[in-house]
């Protein structure tokens, strides 16, 4: 009863500080539960607790952003602290989406550390004055703030999670070339084959991009190529996990790329209204273009060249670093029109 009374007496700033710490604790707990579930797969409860932790983290971060929105009077995307928490919220939301697609604990093993790291950086590494809500600078007092920044951060979240799953694919396959079930679009042609692992069929669902590419096509489907033997040293269970990681990575990148495109276009329109030019080759703009080109090359290679497995995973791994440079790295320069809210 005393605890409830104490919580009821907190103001919005105190609620934000509390939710800040709770979000980190819940993310850390979810990560540890997922890792425990991977180490002891017979204990199903561990993975279920990891899922509960990621749901809790998503709701806690949403509550934190809502409290900050009410307290500050604007949507909380004006500085690095706020954008990091929104990015973490996007990562946890996409984790839940990917888990819905795959039903695989290994998605959580991969994505929970990413969410935990982002929240830890925001909650523990940033100075206290950076975590306080500040009045919007004139350039950010626009309705375009929510449109441009939210879409860009959701794009970053999708691309980061998708790229991280591609890195996990390379680890699982030990960097070897493997023959995956189905084609690079995530479709199975010809008669369906019995699954060799409980999670195999979930990994072969068509990606959003594949559904668009093959919509309306009525030509006969080619027969599925004969199965290839597993590379030496890679068990069949690892190959089924690799299939899950490859297809889920592709689907998330296929989701993040159009969001990135929309975000860049919205930013260009906003820039023209604020500064009188659509494009000024600001460092952030330049790296956003580089990010777009990297993932455009990834999707082009998969859709038109039929790439799958190792080669697109390497390209996505490059994209993982490029996204971080675009989001955080260019802020180290302290220059340009996008240098708001850095702590140097």
From Swiss-Prot:
Transmembrane stretches, start-end: 21-41, 45-65, 80-100, 106-126, 151-171, 252-272, 287-307, 313-333
Molecular function as annotated in GO: heme binding
GO biological process: cytochrome complex assembly
A Pfam family assignment: Cytochrom_C_asm
One cellular component (GO) term of this entry: plasma membrane-derived thylakoid membrane
Keyword Thylakoid in record: yes
Function summary: Required during biogenesis of c-type cytochromes (cytochrome c6 and cytochrome f) at the step of heme attachment.
HAMAP family per UniProt: CytC_CcsA
Family that this chain belongs to: Belongs to the CcmF/CycK/Ccl1/NrfE/CcsA family.
Self-association and partners: May interact with ccs1.
Protein name in UniProt: Cytochrome c biogenesis protein CcsA
Lineage: Bacteria, Bacillati, Cyanobacteriota, Cyanophyceae, Synechococcales
């Amino acid at each position: 009863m005393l605890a409830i009374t104490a919580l009821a007496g907190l103001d919005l700033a105190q609620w934000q500080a509390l939710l800040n710490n709770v979000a980190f604790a819940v993310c850390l707990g979810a990560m540890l539960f997922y890792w425990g579930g991977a180490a002891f797969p017979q204990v199903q409860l561990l993975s279920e607790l990891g899922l509960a932790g990621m749901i809790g983290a998503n709701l806690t971060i949403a509550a934190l952003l809502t409290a900050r929105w009410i307290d500050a009077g604007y949507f909380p995307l004006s500085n690095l602290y706020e954008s990091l928490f929104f990015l973490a919220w996007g990562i946890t939301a996409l984790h839940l989406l990917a888990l819905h697609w795959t039903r695989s604990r290994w998605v959580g093993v991969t994505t929970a550390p990413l969410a935990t790291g982002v929240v830890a950086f925001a909650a523990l590494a940033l100075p206290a004055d950076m975590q306080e809500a500040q009045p919007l600078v004139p350039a950010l007092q626009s309705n375009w703030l929510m449109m441009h920044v939210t879409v860009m951060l959701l794009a970053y979240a999708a691309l980061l999670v998708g790229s991280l799953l591609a890195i996990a694919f390379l680890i699982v396959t030990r960097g070897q070339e493997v023959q995956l079930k189905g084609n690079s679009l995530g479709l199975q042609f010809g008669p369906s084959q019995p699954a060799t692992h409980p999670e195999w069929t979930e990994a072969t669902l068509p990606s959003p991009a594949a559904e668009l590419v093959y919509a309306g096509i009525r030509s006969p489907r080619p027969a599925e190529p004969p199965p290839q033997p597993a590379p030496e040293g890679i068990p069949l269970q690892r190959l089924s996990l690799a299939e899950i990681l490859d297809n889920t990575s592709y689907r998330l990148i296929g989701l993040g790329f159009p969001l990135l495109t929309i975000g860049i276009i919205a930013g260009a329109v906003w820039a023209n209204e604020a500064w009188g030019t659509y494009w000024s080759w600001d460092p952030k703009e330049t790296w956003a273009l580089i990010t777009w080109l990297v993932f455009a090359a990834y999707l082009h290679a998969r859709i038109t060249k039929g790439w799958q497995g190792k080669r697109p995973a390497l390209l996505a791994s490059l994209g993982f670093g490029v996204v971080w440079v675009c989001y955080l790295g260019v802020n180290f320069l302290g220059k340009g029109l996008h240098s708001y809210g850095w702590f140097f």
